[in-house]
Protein backbone atom coordinates (compact mmCIF):
# COMPACT_ATOMS: atom_id res chain seq x y z
CA UNK A 1 0.00 0.00 0.00
CA UNK A 2 1.05 3.59 -0.61
CA UNK A 3 0.24 6.77 1.29
CA UNK A 4 1.53 10.33 1.47
CA UNK A 5 2.44 12.35 4.53
CA UNK A 6 3.21 16.05 4.85
CA UNK A 7 4.89 18.28 7.40
CA UNK A 8 5.29 22.04 7.64
CA UNK A 9 7.75 24.19 9.59
CA UNK A 10 6.46 27.73 10.05
CA UNK A 11 9.78 29.32 11.09
CA UNK A 12 11.47 28.44 7.79
CA UNK A 13 8.37 28.02 5.56
CA UNK A 14 9.63 24.54 4.70
CA UNK A 15 7.38 21.65 3.78
CA UNK A 16 8.21 18.03 3.05
CA UNK A 17 6.18 15.30 1.36
CA UNK A 18 6.81 11.66 2.25
CA UNK A 19 5.72 8.33 0.81
CA UNK A 20 5.17 5.50 3.28
CA UNK A 21 3.46 2.14 3.52
CA UNK A 22 0.67 1.91 6.14
CA UNK A 23 0.84 -1.90 5.93
CA UNK A 24 4.62 -2.08 6.45
CA UNK A 25 5.67 0.00 9.44
CA UNK A 26 9.25 -1.31 9.22
CA UNK A 27 9.78 0.51 5.93
CA UNK A 28 11.18 4.01 6.42
CA UNK A 29 9.22 6.93 4.93
CA UNK A 30 10.85 8.45 1.84
CA UNK A 31 11.09 12.20 1.27
CA UNK A 32 9.97 12.98 -2.28
CA UNK A 33 9.48 16.77 -2.02
CA UNK A 34 11.45 19.21 0.15
CA UNK A 35 10.73 22.87 -0.54
CA UNK A 36 9.80 26.38 0.55
CA UNK A 37 6.00 26.39 0.34
CA UNK A 38 5.92 30.15 -0.36
CA UNK A 39 8.05 29.73 -3.49
CA UNK A 40 5.31 29.65 -6.12
CA UNK A 41 7.68 29.53 -9.10
CA UNK A 42 9.02 26.15 -7.97
CA UNK A 43 5.75 24.67 -6.73
CA UNK A 44 5.59 21.08 -8.05
CA UNK A 45 1.80 21.03 -7.77
CA UNK A 46 -0.65 18.71 -6.02
CA UNK A 47 -0.96 14.98 -6.49
CA UNK A 48 -3.84 13.84 -8.68
CA UNK A 49 -6.51 11.77 -6.93
CA UNK A 50 -9.41 9.59 -8.00
CA UNK A 51 -12.52 8.08 -6.41
CA UNK A 52 -12.42 4.45 -5.30
CA UNK A 53 -15.27 1.93 -5.14
CA UNK A 54 -16.51 3.49 -1.90
CA UNK A 55 -16.50 7.03 -3.25
CA UNK A 56 -13.43 7.99 -1.23
CA UNK A 57 -10.62 10.11 -2.62
CA UNK A 58 -7.36 8.16 -3.10
CA UNK A 59 -4.09 8.67 -4.98
CA UNK A 60 -4.22 8.06 -8.72
CA UNK A 61 -1.44 5.49 -9.21
CA UNK A 62 -0.66 4.04 -12.63
CA UNK A 63 2.21 1.58 -13.22
CA UNK A 64 4.19 2.86 -10.23
CA UNK A 65 3.69 6.48 -11.29
CA UNK A 66 2.02 9.36 -9.49
CA UNK A 67 0.82 12.53 -11.19
CA UNK A 68 1.26 16.18 -10.21
CA UNK A 69 -1.00 19.01 -11.36
CA UNK A 70 0.46 22.50 -10.85
CA UNK A 71 -0.49 26.17 -11.28
CA UNK A 72 2.64 26.86 -13.31
CA UNK A 73 3.55 30.37 -12.17
CA UNK A 74 6.78 31.62 -13.75
CA UNK A 75 8.47 34.97 -14.18
CA UNK A 76 7.13 35.10 -17.75
CA UNK A 77 3.52 34.17 -16.96
CA UNK A 78 1.33 31.31 -15.80
CA UNK A 79 1.43 27.96 -17.60
CA UNK A 80 -0.35 25.15 -15.68
CA UNK A 81 1.08 21.66 -16.12
CA UNK A 82 0.74 17.94 -15.41
CA UNK A 83 3.81 15.84 -14.56
CA UNK A 84 4.20 12.07 -14.30
CA UNK A 85 6.46 11.03 -11.40
CA UNK A 86 8.26 7.68 -11.27
CA UNK A 87 8.05 6.48 -7.65
CA UNK A 88 11.37 4.64 -7.84
CA UNK A 89 13.61 7.24 -9.48
CA UNK A 90 11.46 10.34 -8.74
CA UNK A 91 12.13 11.42 -12.32
CA UNK A 92 9.42 13.56 -13.89
CA UNK A 93 7.97 13.57 -17.38
CA UNK A 94 5.84 16.54 -18.42
CA UNK A 95 2.61 15.27 -19.93
CA UNK A 96 1.06 18.68 -20.58
CA UNK A 97 1.87 22.36 -20.19
CA UNK A 98 -0.52 25.14 -21.15
CA UNK A 99 0.79 27.44 -23.88
CA UNK A 100 -1.84 30.19 -23.66
CA UNK A 101 -0.47 33.73 -23.46
CA UNK A 102 -3.72 35.55 -24.22
CA UNK A 103 -5.96 33.35 -22.04
CA UNK A 104 -5.89 31.74 -18.60
CA UNK A 105 -6.22 27.97 -18.30
CA UNK A 106 -7.00 26.17 -15.04
CA UNK A 107 -6.48 22.41 -14.87
CA UNK A 108 -9.25 21.05 -12.66
CA UNK A 109 -8.94 17.27 -12.89
CA UNK A 110 -6.99 14.58 -14.73
CA UNK A 111 -8.38 11.16 -15.63
CA UNK A 112 -5.17 9.18 -15.67
CA UNK A 113 -6.30 6.08 -17.54
CA UNK A 114 -7.83 8.05 -20.42
CA UNK A 115 -5.32 10.92 -20.54
CA UNK A 116 -8.23 13.36 -20.29
CA UNK A 117 -8.09 16.75 -18.53
CA UNK A 118 -11.04 18.76 -17.27
CA UNK A 119 -9.98 22.34 -17.84
CA UNK A 120 -11.40 25.86 -17.61
CA UNK A 121 -10.35 28.57 -20.06
CA UNK A 122 -11.03 32.30 -19.79
CA UNK A 123 -9.66 35.72 -20.66
CA UNK A 124 -10.02 39.17 -19.12
CA UNK A 125 -13.29 39.69 -21.05
CA UNK A 126 -14.34 36.09 -21.87
CA UNK A 127 -16.37 34.34 -19.19
CA UNK A 128 -14.81 31.04 -18.00
CA UNK A 129 -15.97 27.94 -19.87
CA UNK A 130 -15.19 24.27 -19.33
CA UNK A 131 -13.51 21.87 -21.75
CA UNK A 132 -12.25 18.32 -22.01
CA UNK A 133 -8.65 18.26 -23.23
CA UNK A 134 -7.64 14.91 -24.77
CA UNK A 135 -3.88 14.47 -24.50
CA UNK A 136 -3.88 11.55 -26.94
CA UNK A 137 -5.38 13.59 -29.79
CA UNK A 138 -4.33 17.05 -28.54
CA UNK A 139 -7.93 18.23 -28.92
CA UNK A 140 -10.34 20.43 -26.95
CA UNK A 141 -14.04 19.68 -26.56
CA UNK A 142 -16.17 22.51 -25.21
CA UNK A 143 -18.76 21.39 -22.67
CA UNK A 144 -20.22 24.73 -21.53
CA UNK A 145 -21.11 27.92 -23.38
CA UNK A 146 -21.46 30.66 -20.76
CA UNK A 147 -21.61 34.26 -21.95
CA UNK A 148 -20.19 37.29 -20.19
CA UNK A 149 -22.99 38.73 -17.98
CA UNK A 150 -20.92 41.78 -16.97
CA UNK A 151 -20.91 43.76 -20.21
CA UNK A 152 -20.64 47.12 -18.43
CA UNK A 153 -17.04 46.37 -17.45
CA UNK A 154 -16.06 44.18 -20.41
CA UNK A 155 -13.93 46.87 -22.08
CA UNK A 156 -12.10 48.24 -19.05
CA UNK A 157 -8.31 48.36 -19.31
CA UNK A 158 -6.47 45.70 -17.28
CA UNK A 159 -2.76 45.02 -16.89
CA UNK A 160 -0.32 43.59 -14.36
CA UNK A 161 2.20 46.27 -13.42
CA UNK A 162 5.60 45.80 -11.79
CA UNK A 163 7.50 48.30 -9.65
CA UNK A 164 10.05 48.40 -6.84
CA UNK A 165 9.81 49.13 -3.15
CA UNK A 166 12.28 51.66 -1.70
CA UNK A 167 14.53 48.80 -0.53
CA UNK A 168 14.61 47.23 -4.01
CA UNK A 169 12.00 44.50 -3.46
CA UNK A 170 10.01 43.83 -6.64
CA UNK A 171 6.27 44.37 -6.26
CA UNK A 172 3.31 43.89 -8.57
CA UNK A 173 -0.40 44.64 -8.82
CA UNK A 174 -3.32 44.49 -11.24
CA UNK A 175 -4.22 47.94 -12.59
CA UNK A 176 -7.73 48.63 -13.89
CA UNK A 177 -8.62 51.81 -15.78
CA UNK A 178 -12.23 52.86 -16.47
CA UNK A 179 -13.73 52.19 -19.88
CA UNK A 180 -12.78 54.93 -22.34
CA UNK A 181 -9.88 56.31 -20.29
CA UNK A 182 -7.28 57.95 -22.57
CA UNK A 183 -3.87 57.21 -21.10
CA UNK A 184 -2.23 59.85 -23.33
CA UNK A 185 -4.19 62.67 -21.69
CA UNK A 186 -2.79 61.70 -18.27
CA UNK A 187 -6.01 62.74 -16.57
CA UNK A 188 -5.88 62.29 -12.81
CA UNK A 189 -8.62 60.12 -11.32
CA UNK A 190 -9.40 58.92 -7.80
CA UNK A 191 -8.00 55.47 -7.07
CA UNK A 192 -8.92 52.60 -4.78
CA UNK A 193 -6.05 50.34 -3.72
CA UNK A 194 -7.01 46.86 -2.48
CA UNK A 195 -4.24 45.10 -0.56
CA UNK A 196 -3.53 42.82 2.38
CA UNK A 197 -0.09 42.31 3.98
CA UNK A 198 1.46 38.83 3.80
CA UNK A 199 4.43 37.49 5.74
CA UNK A 200 7.49 36.07 3.97
CA UNK A 201 10.84 34.68 5.10
CA UNK A 202 12.79 35.52 1.96
CA UNK A 203 12.93 38.30 -0.61
CA UNK A 204 12.78 35.97 -3.60
CA UNK A 205 9.39 34.48 -2.72
CA UNK A 206 8.01 37.89 -1.76
CA UNK A 207 8.84 39.28 -5.22
CA UNK A 208 7.17 36.58 -7.30
CA UNK A 209 4.26 37.58 -9.55
CA UNK A 210 1.11 35.53 -9.01
CA UNK A 211 -1.39 37.81 -10.79
CA UNK A 212 -2.60 36.86 -14.26
CA UNK A 213 -3.76 39.63 -16.59
CA UNK A 214 -5.89 37.10 -18.49
CA UNK A 215 -8.02 36.18 -15.48
CA UNK A 216 -11.65 37.07 -16.10
CA UNK A 217 -12.67 40.37 -14.52
CA UNK A 218 -15.28 39.06 -12.11
CA UNK A 219 -17.07 41.62 -9.88
CA UNK A 220 -17.69 39.36 -6.89
CA UNK A 221 -19.45 40.54 -3.75
CA UNK A 222 -17.31 43.11 -1.97
CA UNK A 223 -14.99 43.55 -4.95
CA UNK A 224 -13.53 47.03 -5.62
CA UNK A 225 -14.04 46.41 -9.36
CA UNK A 226 -17.52 47.97 -9.17
CA UNK A 227 -15.90 51.38 -8.69
CA UNK A 228 -14.67 51.31 -12.29
CA UNK A 229 -18.24 52.12 -13.36
CA UNK A 230 -18.04 55.29 -11.24
CA UNK A 231 -14.87 56.57 -12.86
CA UNK A 232 -12.35 55.28 -10.33
CA UNK A 233 -9.01 53.64 -11.05
CA UNK A 234 -8.64 50.34 -9.18
CA UNK A 235 -5.31 48.88 -8.09
CA UNK A 236 -6.19 45.34 -7.03
CA UNK A 237 -4.30 42.35 -5.61
CA UNK A 238 -1.42 44.61 -4.63
CA UNK A 239 1.79 42.99 -3.34
CA UNK A 240 2.18 43.90 0.34
CA UNK A 241 4.99 41.63 1.59
CA UNK A 242 6.22 41.84 5.16
CA UNK A 243 9.64 40.15 5.11
CA UNK A 244 11.88 38.81 7.86
CA UNK A 245 14.93 36.90 6.64
CA UNK A 246 17.11 34.64 8.79
CA UNK A 247 16.50 35.14 12.51
CA UNK A 248 14.40 38.24 11.88
CA UNK A 249 10.64 37.85 12.04
CA UNK A 250 8.45 39.62 9.46
CA UNK A 251 6.43 41.60 11.97
CA UNK A 252 9.54 43.02 13.67
CA UNK A 253 9.45 45.80 11.04
CA UNK A 254 5.78 45.64 10.16
CA UNK A 255 4.97 49.35 10.17
CA UNK A 256 7.98 50.44 8.13
CA UNK A 257 7.42 47.79 5.47
CA UNK A 258 3.70 48.52 5.38
CA UNK A 259 4.42 52.19 4.60
CA UNK A 260 7.08 51.25 2.02
CA UNK A 261 4.61 48.96 0.26
CA UNK A 262 2.06 51.74 -0.02
Q: What are these model-predicted stretches?
A:
Residues 1-139, 145-156, 170, 207-208:
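Beta-propeller folds
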Residues 108-262:
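Serine-hydrolase catalytic core recognition
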Amino acid sequence: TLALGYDYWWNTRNTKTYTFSPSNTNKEPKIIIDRNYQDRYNDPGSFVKRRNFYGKSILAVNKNNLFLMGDGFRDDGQFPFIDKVDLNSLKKVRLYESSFKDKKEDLLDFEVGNNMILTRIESASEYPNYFFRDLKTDSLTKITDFENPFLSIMDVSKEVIEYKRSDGIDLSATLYLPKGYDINKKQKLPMIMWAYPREFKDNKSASQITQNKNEFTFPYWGSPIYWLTRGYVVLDDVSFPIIGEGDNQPNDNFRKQLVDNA
